[in-house]
A protein has these predicted regions:
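Positively charged n-region of N-terminal signal peptides that target proteins for export
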Residues: 1-4, 725
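Sec-dependent N-terminal signal peptides
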Residues: 4-12
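Sec/Tat signal peptide C-region and signal peptidase I cleavage site
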Residues: 15-18
Length: 762
């Protein structure tokens, strides 16, 4: 009885708060936008009531408008309630939609629900067939940590014979729709046992900030510890946009802050923790190398969380930073004292979450996939990512897909089929002919390796139609289904080698610097006398690497040129240097030895190859026609841009040196910030030099000598080229056999002629 009373009360409430509908005045015009504080997303002040606009596109990851097709269609989106928000009355869902003008209003409706509670049912009329916005109040009490926003549409265009696949049956939900949260910030619960919360939580929205308070006199070990903390947090925040800030004092911001360093290096620590809190017995008798991690609420502002990573000495600070990777396994409460860190890192080179296994033959279950079933006329495509490093070279022969699938009984074998698409190209389809259905059927498909690259997307689509399908009769489609089994196997015959240097490969998850996920073979080389800007630039690059990896530990090193003593400290590492000849001796040495194209005097005269349209023979045999052109970079570009230049390491031919270069230190951040902006990163094209200016205009220049980098023997490389150029070699073989035939024929003819002459003489 109480449940019935509750439901009646809810409908009365929603009736009193009827949704307001704003319509367009004319077709083709955009929805009128009302500017508000929520649109500009100002930084919250942690006082009073705040608002946040969570858009479908940016916050709910809806990349394109949602289209609901057919007589009946549903779509679900998941959204969260951030743990540090107390949601208030006045929160709203703004849905922007349009639909086919052919729909009958008496039979067509769009219903919107949150957590199975219907907020509104809208009749689909000609008036709202153009882009229309409806505003739905959200009762705060129906929200949970994770919520489901559902759209259900019933749509019809005629009272007579009706085709369920008619193009007139559609309703579209715009990706510009959004949820407007009205909330009051609340104090977080701070406990190292749930790290990285509250410094990051998957339920949060928007760009996440990592705010460091700069040590006043840091050592390279402390800077390395800061980098470790940044790397770890960036890894947690990999699917969100990240902004890294450095403040000289915690009072410069009211956001969560992170303080790294010894108390001597970073005296700001004492504003949040006394000596008694930091070390037992005020540090008396504590052994060198001991680290301490403290997480607590700011005593002066409980809504702010503070993370302190400190130690008796810089080595203890670094140890505390590495301990954050273990998280709740070894950390608890608001303080943890770190004596030793026993890191267990089982990842091998090239092993990375979300990437295909290293072995040539694997099952989809090894990618984390489970048996997946889809139903109905509009069965959703089953998407499978097949990611690999950019130096993977696939052999044309021997790569196969053995698709294992099942489908229901009662399918029309003339119309129902399964289709496999790789990188948006259909490669095979097969009719589902068995009226009784099939279990664990197989489809063996040779994989066209010429379609494959570093980022491969395989899509399997079931096109399902019930037996005796009649568009003029209403037939249920929920009983027809298809399943892809996780035991499906893929064989990809491949080796790993690539032409270097090529800076653009860094856009593929930081290649080659992240082949080891803990980056144990990477050295970051700061200027001799580094400053705050240099440290910020380092953290920007580390943030990108952290977002692109899935490590179990962190092992890269941060050094200055004076620490690069002896070949053993450089030959086994990729080196990444920041600055220019004036402030970084290592860069100056590379420039003096003529390893770099970018110099303090400008940029060398660059001759590049301009790609032209391929001729008939080039299309058959591969390769590109080239014409020499001169690449000119204006002085303005040189002065105002930041550069990434990559060269083969002079210490190890299988390693590289990446120079982050600019005449002006402030310009160094442009290419580093570009790495954190996906739409800019995609503009990185093949080249050993990439320039990015303040407008994020990207220029790629491909000059200098190339070499094959990779662990591959001569015969394997020969096998690859033979397999890749089978057509060319076949034609050359035919030509060679023809020439051999002509030579043999000429010899035989000459021999016959000579014999004939000898016989005539006799």
């Amino acid at each position: 009885m109480r449940k019935v009373t509750f439901i009646l009360a809810f409908f009365v409430l929603t009736g009193l708060n009827a949704a307001r509908i704003r319509k367009k005045t004319a077709p083709g015009k955009p929805v009128k936008k009302v500017k508000s504080a929520a649109q500009t997303q100002p930084a919250p002040s942690y006082s009073g009531i705040q608002t946040y606009r969570a858009t479908f596109e940016k916050d709910l990851y809806v990349k394109k408008d949602i289209t609901l097709k057919g007589l009946h269609a549903t779509e679900r989106l998941t959204f969260t309630r951030p743990p540090r928000w107390n949601i208030l009355e006045g929160s709203e869902i703004h849905i922007i939609f349009n639909h086919s003008e052919a729909l009958l209003p008496s039979l067509s409706h769009l219903s919107i629900a949150v957590n199975n509670i219907t907020l509104k049912s809208v009749t689909l009329t000609k008036e709202n067939s153009v882009s229309t916005e409806i505003v739905l109040p959200i009762p705060p009490y129906i929200l949970e940590d994770y919520n489901v926003l559902s759209f259900l549409v019933d749509q019809h265009y005629t009272l007579d014979c009706e085709d369920p696949f008619s193009p007139a049956l559609w309703t579209k939900i715009s990706k510009k729709s959004y949820i407007l949260f009205k909330y009051r910030p609340i104090s977080p619960i701070v406990n190292l046992g749930v790290f990285p919360h509250p410094f990051f939580d998957k339920r949060d929205y928007g760009t996440r900030e990592i705010n460091f308070v700069m040590p006043s006199i840091p050592t390279t070990t402390t800077i390395q510890a800061m980098s470790y903390v940044d790397f770890i947090l960036s890894n947690y925040i990999s699917f969100r946009n990240v902004r890294v800030n450095i403040f000289r004092s915690a009072s410069e911001t009211d956001k969560d802050v992170i303080l790294v360093g010894t108390v001597k290096e970073n005296p700001e620590i004492l504003k949040f923790a006394s000596t008694d809190e930091l070390f037992p017995s005020k540090g008396v008798g504590v052994s060198p190398g001991t680290g301490v991690i403290i997480a607590k609420n700011d005593p002066r502002n409980p809504r702010r969380a503070v993370l302190i990573v400190t130690g008796v000495d810089p080595r203890g600070v670094e140890k505390a930073a590495r301990a954050l990777f273990a998280g709740s396994k070894i950390l608890s409460g608001q303080r943890s004292i770190i004596y030793e860190v026993n890191e267990v890192d089982t990842l091998k080179e090239r092993e990375q979450k979300g990437y295909i296994p290293l072995k040539k033959k694997f099952e989809l279950s090894e990618l984390g996939m489970v048996d997946t079933t889809v139903r109905g006329f509009y069965a959703k495509p089953i998407d499978i990512n097949l990611f690999t490093q950019p130096d993977a070279q696939f052999f044309p022969k021997g790569s196969r897909l053995k698709l294992i699938y099942s489908y229901s009984a009662g399918l029309d074998g003339r119309l129902s089929m399964i289709e496999v698409i790789i990188n948006q190209r259909s490669v095979v389809s097969k009719l589902l002919r068995n009226k009784a259905g099939e279990s664990f059927a197989t489809l063996d498909v040779p994989l066209p390796t010429w379609l494959l690259g570093p980022r491969n997307h395989m899509t399997v689509i079931f096109h399902l139609f019930p037996i005796n399908f009649d568009p003029c009769r209403r037939i249920s489609d929920k009983q027809i289904w298809g399943t892809i089994h996780a035991s499906t196997t893929i064989k990809l015959d491949r080796e790993y080698f690539v032409e270097m240097p090529d800076v653009s490969l860094i856009k593929f998850s930081g290649y080659p610097y992240t082949l080891w996920q803990n980056m144990k073979d990477v050295l970051f080389v700061l200027p001799d006398k580094f400053n705050v800007e240099d440290i910020h630039n380092l953290l920007l690059l580390v943030t990108y690497f952290g977002k692109e990896t899935s490590p179990q530990s962190v092992k890269f090193k941060v050094v200055t040129p004076g620490m690069l003593s002896g070949p053993d400290y450089t030959k086994d590492y990729h080196l990444i240097a920041f600055g220019n000849e004036s402030n970084n001796r290592f860069i100056r040495d590379l420039s003096d030895r003529k390893y770099l194209y970018i110099t303090k005097k400008g940029i060398k005269s660059l001759k590049t190859f301009e790609k032209k349209k391929k001729s008939f023979w080039k299309r058959i045999f591969g390769g590109e026609e080239e014409g020499i052109t001169t690449e000119v970079i204006k002085a303005y570009d040189y002065d105002s841009a930041g550069f990434l230049e990559q060269v083969i390491s002079p210490f190890n031919k299988n390693k590289t040196v990446l120079v982050v270069y600019s005449r002006n230190t402030a310009n160094l951040r442009y290419p580093l910030e570009a790495l954190l902006i996906p739409r800019i990163l995609t503009k990185f094209k093949k080249g050993n030099i990439i320039a990015v200016n303040s407008s994020f205009e990207v220029r790629s220049i491909d000059v200098g000598k190339k070499r094959i980098v990779g662990k591959v023997g001569f015969f394997k490389k020969l096998r690859f080229y033979i397999a890749k150029h089978t057509l060319l070699l076949s034609i050359l073989l035919i030509i060679a056999l023809y020439l051999l035939y002509k030579v043999v024929r000429a010899i035989v003819d000459a021999y016959k002629k000579r014999r004939l002459m000898e016989e005539e003489e006799e």
